[in-house]
Amino acid sequence: MIFKYIVAVSFLIASGYARSVKNDEQSLSQREVLEEESLREIRGIGGALLSVGKSALKGLAKGFAEHFGKRTAEDHEVMKRLEAVIRDLDSLDHSEEASERETRGFNQEEIANLFTKKEKRILGPVLGLVSNAIGGLIKKIG
């Protein structure tokens, strides 16, 4: 009779443990889904900011070209750099799906680090070029 109680208690403990493991797996998968959704939202926001930045740079380049008409060699070089930056930004938009496929095996932190490194690598030179272009134009006007 004691043996039956031992078997029954062992069975209850095993089933409780199995339920807790199953619940842990479900909560882990739910957490992964939430992290993936938040990462997609972040990518969407980043894509929107990049598109706004691209359109602003394109408008700025067109405005400079219309306002000044003829360009000096220095202005031409600055405009070429701005156009190269715009092309780099365009390539970022198209490579997002490819990079998403490449990074499926990485964990979420590694993915976030990859995108922030890419953004820093592109935004630094963009801001430098824009500030140099605006500074040069202000000097010419002033």
Swiss-Prot record:
Pfam families from the UniProt entry: Bombinin (PF05298)
Propeptide boundaries: 19-43, 72-121
Subcellular localization(s) per the UniProt record: Secreted
One of the GO BP terms on file: killing of cells of another organism
This protein's record includes keyword Transport: no
Transmembrane regions listed in the UniProt entry: none
Cited function: Maximin-y shows antimicrobial activity against bacteria and against the fungus C.albicans. It has little hemolytic activity. Maximin-Hw shows antimicrobial activity against bacteria and against the fungus C.albicans. Shows strong hemolytic activity.
Recorded family membership: Belongs to the bombinin family.
The name this protein goes by in its record: Maximins y/Hw
Classification of source organism: Eukaryota, Metazoa, Chordata, Craniata, Vertebrata
